[in-house]
């Protein structure tokens, strides 16, 4: 029978990944700033949608982290 992985190790990995998702969300969000108020609202909208998706991913990872602890 295979050994089950340590929840401590899983929690640590989830913490690192959630932190990375947060930093990526911030980076992605800042990409829209130069285009605010220009005729590139299509680009701003797409960037903001990507930022929202990263926020949702981070929240899901945080929930998984709480479950693993």
Question: Residue ranges of each PLM-predicted region?
Answer:
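N-terminal acidic leader/helix
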Residues: 1-31
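Short, charge-rich amphipathic interface segments used for partner binding and complex assembly
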Residues: 30-67
